[in-house]
Structures are given as C-alpha cells and as structure tokens.
C-alpha cells in the first residue's frame, strides 16, 4: 500500500511538472501571431512621443505588430538601410524618400504614413533677446545640407523675411553632433529638437529663443516609408 501511494505521488509530481514546463515553454498565441518589424529611427526625441506610446502601451501589438526601434542617425542613412533590406521600415524626413525617387531607383521608397506635421526644432542662442533679424551675420548650425531640418530652417527664414544669404548657415556638422559642437564653441546659434534644446538651456550653454515650426507652418515633416 505504501509503495502504491509513493508511486501515485511520484506520478502526480511528474504530471504537474510536465504541465508547468508546457505552460512556461509554450509561446503565447499573441507572441506567435506578431509580425516583427525592424524600424530605422532617424533620431530619438520627445517630438516622436506618439510612436513611443503606441509601442510601449501595446497599441501596435493589438494590430499584430512587434516593433524594434533601431537608432539610425541621418535620414540618408535611414533610406540606405531600408533600400539595402537591412531594415523593413524607415522613419525620417520625407525628403530622403523623394531623393531616392528622383535618383531613378526602381525599387524606390514609398511613404505610407506620417507622424509629425510641423518642424519640432527650436533655435538656441547665447542671448535671451531675439528676433529673426538677430541671425543676420551669425553662424547657425543646422545639420546636413538638403536634410529636412536644414530645408525647413530655410523656409522659416523666408517666411520671416530674412535673406538666407545674409546668414552664415553651417551644414558641415551632422545632426546627431549638433549639441556637442555648439557646447564646444562652434556657432552662434544651433537648431535642436527636444530634449536637447531644454538640456542646453538647463546646463547654461544658451537659451531657447524661437520655434522654427511656428514660422515654417504645417508640412509632412517626419514619415514612415518602405520599399515599393
């Protein structure tokens, strides 16, 4: 009788162990049904908060999508990563997709959704007092020539009635290095997204003096694209 009870106990333990192992190792239905997408993100900024909320709060998973963000500084590099097939989706300025199309690429990039419709850059200066004419004769760090931040800054200058030829626009510093260059003493003004703009002011390297988006108006500033 004692041997029988021991055998039953061992059997129960084995069954319970098998059930636990099955539950732990079996992928959930939700996991197996998710389509994983690698998304090239041009920069990480509070400006893109809706995207982060959609990922963290599970809104994309509800649609069957699992997104992994890959920081890829520079819209040109985002476009290259998508064209090469290294990443499925690009998230950057729409100008990068236009350049690819104009270049005659057969499998060009197609923009299928937008996130931001206004420039999120702020101008940082060394003095609190500012009007747009303050930029005349001064060096302004704007990032890569032909990039959306630089193009939109030119648009803001035009809308402010400022002749761009009277502003020393520095295109030589890549977008990801703008804060460091300005802290290091390059330029009189620099155009930055948040949180970098506020951080520079907090660390007393300058003052947030103007919003570029306020003057440049609405436009498809940052969007999602994939190969045709």
Label the predicted regions.
Residues 200:
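Short helix- or helix-capping micro-motifs
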Residues 1-27:
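Secretory targeting signatures
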Residues 223-228:
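Extracytoplasmic/periplasmic substrate-recognition and gating elements
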């Amino acid at each position: 009788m004692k041997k029988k009870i021991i055998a039953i106990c061992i059997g129960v333990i084995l069954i319970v162990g098998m059930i636990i192992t099955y539950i732990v190792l079996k992928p959930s239905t939700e996991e197996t049904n998710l389509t994983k997408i690698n998304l090239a993100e041009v920069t990480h900024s509070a400006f893109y908060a809706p995207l982060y909320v959609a990922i963290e709060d599970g809104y994309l998973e509800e649609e069957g999508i699992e997104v992994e963000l890959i920081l890829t500084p520079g819209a040109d590099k985002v476009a290259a990563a998508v064209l090469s097939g290294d990443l499925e989706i690009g998230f950057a300025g729409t100008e990068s997709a236009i350049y690819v199309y104009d270049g005659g690429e057969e499998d060009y990039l197609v923009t299928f959704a937008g996130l931001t419709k206004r420039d999120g850059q702020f101008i940082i200066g060394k003095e609190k007092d500012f009007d747009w004419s303050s930029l005349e004769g001064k060096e302004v760090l704007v990032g890569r020539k032909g990039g959306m931040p630089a193009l939109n800054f030119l648009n803001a200058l035009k809308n402010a009635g400022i002749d761009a030829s009277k502003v020393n626009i520095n295109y030589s510093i890549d977008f990801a290095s703008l804060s460091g260059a300005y802290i290091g003493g390059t330029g009189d003004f620099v155009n930055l997204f948040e949180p970098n703009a506020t951080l520079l002011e907090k660390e007393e390297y300058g003052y947030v003096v103007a919003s570029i988006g306020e003057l440049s108006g609405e436009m498809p500033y940052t969007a999602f694209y994939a190969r045709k």
